[in-house]
Amino acid sequence: MLIMSSIKELYHAVSINDRFSVVNILEKKNIPIDYINFHPDNPLLEAVKLTNTDMIKTLLDYGICINTRDILGNTALHLIAMDYYVPHNDIKHGHHNDYVFKMVPIINLFLRKKANINACNNLNQTPLHLAAESNNTTLLKILLYNNAKVNILDIYGNTCLHYAVRGRNIESIKLLLSYNVDVNIRNFTYWYSALHEAVQIGDSKISRCIVSLLLCNKANVNTRCRLNTTPIFYAINCIDTLKLLLENGADINATSDNDNAVIHLATENRRYDIIKTLLDYGADVNMIGYRGKTPLYYATENYSYRNMKLLLDHGSNPNIADHIMNTPLFISIKCTCIENTKMLLDSGADINHVNDNGETPISYLAPNLIPTPVAILVISHIVLLKTKYNHIKYLPGFIKNISVIQNFTKFNNIKKVCEDEFRFMRSVSLSANHNLSSYICNDNLHTLVRFIKNPKIYYSINKIRIYRNRLYSIIERLLNRKKLHDLVLELIKDIGVFNKLPLDIISMILDFLSDDDLALMAIFN
């Protein structure tokens, strides 16, 4: 008890900077040094916290162990690295250089006395780990210059580089990289490399800067963590970092344990800008992910018209089914999204597709759950397909759809109106071989441009309800084409071989060209 009391007395004397009492206690009370070294109230560590160089020298001169530790296993160098001696507000605002420079003589004193610069605390952290974490570049430089080991792992497998990256400490990162720290070591918890950590930094400028530093020092851009994900998976919140990874060889179609690629993740999180960037860099728009879902499937689940359009414009196949053979159209109709459903149908989604349970997109739900606008859109499409393609009526999905329609009065009434409108359109003759329904049923619309100003069309359209908007859309497109057609005809009729041909023949030739081809001819002539 007397020894313990004396140690506490010594500790108190150090804390109030009473050097006379310290010397007196050490000389007269015969306290065994080992007791002091292992006591929780360690006078040397207290002197370090107080940045009291003279007191530190005094204690060391009297034999206090230079590598003495606190209950957490921290030595004096650990405490210096953690900025224990800096007021909290100064650390918070980054104004602690003056305090750090005060410690340089103390640090040098410890190094002259052969302090263990690679000592590990209870978490297996060295002073280098903690200096990197607190961005104590002064201590970091001194430790590195004195051959501190840069690749020691803490109990979680983190190197000092992991700490510096998490702390967003760019200067510390540069220092460590200049001393050949291994940039590709992965920790034990998530198997994160420093690059995994860097791409998850919220600030895009800092993230890009750190990622660039790591990549310049041969960081593996495709290293995988415990979830089998590469750093690119964590860059979906920072487009600049994403581009940097892609420009340095990141595998854009790499998949995780659940088979999803980055484009699935971006679509699931409704990130239009990221999806567009991935597509611009060559991501597979039809990549099969978790449970057979494509990016379009996720976009449909998220009611995201904009993302769906982007994917479809880049060639997404709307008929790729998931693990139970549901296509995005099943989801769109289930969600009663009329705009999304229309876009899928216009892009070639198969309304007669049958899933593993023998259901089609409209039999998938109870008929009374499908809103009237969606029902009109879908049933009018089915009637259109039946009119255009005779073989459709033999398909199991079509037979199932017709059965659902006929067994539900509202659906059957819609079907009858659609069929009546087709009969009416066929009665509006435009030529010996063409009638108003040709604008909906004919896949080669270019040949119909010649009839576009026939007054019968505009008079008759007003009598049509369900297919009116479809007709107006087609006619508007053809009117624009006619303007382009007539412009090109005027430009080329007197050029080369064309001046020897009748205008009707030239016009027929132009009918076989696409709108894009006509536009190019108009530009270059």
UniProtKB/Swiss-Prot annotation:
Keywords: ANK repeat, Repeat. ANK repeats lie at residues 39-71, 72-122, 123-152, 156-185, 190-226, 227-254, 258-287, 291-320, 324-353. InterPro entries: Ankyrin_rpt, Ankyrin_rpt-contain_sf, PRANC_domain. Pfam families: Ank_2, PRANC. It comes from the Viruses. PANTHER family: ANK_REP_REGION DOMAIN-CONTAINING PROTEIN, ANKYRIN REPEAT, PH AND SEC7 DOMAIN CONTAINING PROTEIN SECG-RELATED. This is Putative ankyrin repeat protein FPV228. It comes from Fowlpox virus (strain NVSL).
